Amino acid sequence: MTHSTLPPQPFAILAMPRTGTHYLEELVNEHPNVLSNGELLNTYDTNWPDKERLLLSDRELLERAFLRYPPHSDKKVTHVGCKINEPQFQERPSFFAELTAWPGLKVILVIRRNTLESLRSFVQARQTRQWLKFKSDSSAPPPPVMLPFATCEAYFKAADDFHARVVYAFDSSRIRLIEYERLLRDPVPCVATVLDFLGAPALQLADRGILRRQETRPLDQTVRNFHELRVHFANGPYARFFELAND
């Protein structure tokens, strides 16, 4: 692989699961100088041909991500990144500290306003084993799911703790928050914000993405015990996750 004199500037997309990071990455990768290589810590991510990389030390794995990344023949890469989801940090506890110490790293933290939507989507994907849906896919939406009280509470707390941990760990100049809802509503200006933050040249993206949302129905149609959950979490810090558009 041919590199420029200076190594590409590194970035990482961090998020809870099911927050639109695949879509964001797809759009960012339309830029001829930006390359995001998928989930670094995911054994099955096809962007990384070598599963053995996960046997490397944390430092060596980051070198693999930012210095010895898989080649991409049609790009002159000036900014290179990867994605990491919160559960993957749990599986590799020492990795977060090594990531925060990487010189010059910029972080894009993607947040979904309604964490219940994130959990519901995560459970649906695990149960159906369907993690992505493409625009050409006309299959039926996934079946509704049951979500135990304890599972919801643990997930809500994990999301709060993770977001706080990331914000606390990085200087404000090195982190940019992106809302899932804004990304869906206004993808082009949202990606322009990301590119400006990274320092990549401005580019009018075509939004030729091939991904689509797997689930568009409201929560009361996709979570079988939604109303029981709503009562359980009423008047608490997570009550807002159970508000419906027609309330």
Curated annotation (Swiss-Prot):
Cited PANTHER family: PROTEIN, PUTATIVE, EXPRESSED-RELATED (PTHR32175:SF26)
Protein name: Nodulation protein H
Function: Required for the formation of sulfated nod factor. Proposed to transfer activated sulfate (PAPS) to a N-acetylglucosamine of the nod factor.
Gene name as annotated: nodH
UniProt keyword list: Nodulation, Plasmid, Transferase
Stretches the record annotates as Hydrophobic: 1-17
Molecular function as annotated in GO: transferase activity
InterPro entries per UniProt: Nod_factor_sulfotransferase, P-loop_NTPase
Top-level taxonomic group: Bacteria
EC code(s) of this entry: 2.8.2.-
